[in-house]
Amino acid sequence: PNLEWMLDNFGGTLKQQAAEKNMNIYDYMEELIETVPIGSRGVMYHPYLLAGGERAPFTDSRARASYTGISVRHTIVDIVRATYEGVAFAMLDCYQHMPQEIKQVTLCGGGAKSPGWSQMFADILGSKIVTIKGNELGAKGVILNNAVVQGYYKDYKEAVDATVEIKKVYEPDMKKHKEYMKFYPLYKKTYDQLKETWKLRSSLIGEE
């Protein structure tokens, strides 16, 4: 929901500009973020929008989304890129807590429809990103799971091989990965330092 929320609340001008160019708003944003360097000129976004807070890689029901590092020199385009980067950093944060190295990630949902964002995921994770043809892939996964349980396929590999078709593969640009890794410690340190702020905020407005 992060891009949608950002567009709904801050994206009026962007939507107008995209309409004037007769462009899809997401295609237009992909063009714009290419004009901003890695690190979004120091703007950092933490994508904890859900009312229940964050569940991985840490659990904190009081965690809330925020932009940090904004000054008068920044523009909406910096904020847009920071939103893209923040979601990808959050995914990296989760994968770095897993016991084995992640060499390939299958991406689905809204982010998978965005070539620029899919490539950003690959560059930030330092892993190959695979997108899949089709829609409602979560529902498809439920159906395939049931099909394996019922014995229509002998295992998940057979089910996937028979029904899933790769749309595109994104290879990581390791030079860009190294640049992103300069900013990743800032992402983690910022949310660590915000935890006491989240706690105080929740107590003040009665969310505890």
Predicted regions: what is each one?
Residues 1-108, 112-208:
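Active-site core segments that coordinate phosphate-bearing ligands/cofactors
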